[in-house]
Amino acid sequence: VYMDPFLPINDEKRLAERLFEELSPRFDLTRSEVRDAVHAAWLEQEAFRDETARKGEETLAEIRERGLKGIVLAGRPYHLDPEINHGIPELLTGLGLAVLTEDSVAHLGNIERPLRIVDQWTYHNRLYRAAQYTTGNRDIELVQLTSFGCGLDAVTSDQVQEILEAKGRMYTLIKIDEGSNLGAVRIRMRSLIAAIKERDRRETEEKVRPASYKRVVFTKEMKKRYTIL
């Protein structure tokens, strides 16, 4: 049976109600069974998020203790699939870098607002917080994975770049669907490592400016001198 109903997955109580409404006509399930299953899944999801954040903090502590460098490999959930990411995480660890996902450090970052875009998606918000946290820590860099098929990535890549460059940090973007050849990716990662080492060797001071976006407001006084197209 194929079913594709709308489900409010951000509301545990309402999610249980909707699942019961959709499943009970086809399956022998009671309301309490559905409610208990949703609650168990909810607890497991929270436990997963807590463990991810804890592992992120543990990895950051080890990086600093051992004097290593880390990469926040920021991508969508499907980029975790080895068939999609083409082994980029393993490539990075093979180069001596620790690899973290954006959701393992996002809870440590606070976004400088306002942003230039409308920040209305959970993944985007998590990505921007991870980028903001990266700007304040020289032992980690952010590499963003995007897929051409996802149009919203064009918005996130511009905003992440602005957040990083506002604090003088390097921005690296890898477009997953440009090919499965890791040779080009390996060259870019080696170049990034070389740039990091050169920056640290020179002890270059990063030029810092606010990452928040200053909107230009059209006032009545501007009416005589400007035209909105």
Describe these PLM feature segments.
Residues 1-229:
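An N-terminal assembly and electron-transfer interface module characteristic of large anaerobic redox
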